[in-house]
UniProtKB/Swiss-Prot annotation:
Belongs to the bacterial ribosomal protein bL12 family. Keywords: Ribonucleoprotein, Ribosomal protein. The gene is rplL. One of its GO terms (cellular component) is cytosolic large ribosomal subunit. It comes from Chlamydia abortus (strain DSM 27085 / S26/3) (Chlamydophila abortus). This is Large ribosomal subunit protein bL12. Homodimer. Part of the ribosomal stalk of the 50S ribosomal subunit. Forms a multimeric L10(L12)X complex, where L10 forms an elongated spine to which 2 to 4 L12 dimers bind in a sequential fashion. Binds GTP-bound translation factors.
Amino acid sequence: MTKVTTQSLETLVETLSSLTVLELSALKKLLEEKWDVTAAAPVMAVAAGAAGAGAEAAPAESTEFAVTLEEVPADKKIGVLKVVREVTGLALKEAKEMTEGLPKVVKEKTSKSDAEETVKKLQEAGAKASFKGL
């Protein structure tokens, strides 16, 4: 860079630094019109803004789900134990512990289809189960 360019840039920076927020906003609009562009926020900033908007923005659907075992009738415990062992791969002792002191999360970070299938199997065995997005 030449000395003239550097000096003119420094002068420009000083001038811009002295502008008020309203003047900067007006400058932004003028530049958008002159150059036929828009000042779009980066994707991450837009996502953060949408998360902060709460009820205004539609929530994105979860991709990971947790299956919760809520209730097991005493007469259905053996059937539910078999399903818990099948879907979790746990040994008998751990599966038995899983069915006591409910509610307990049986499966975490699983796909929606897998969560639905797991809940269906548990309900068919007589348990009360549900899933929710993480």
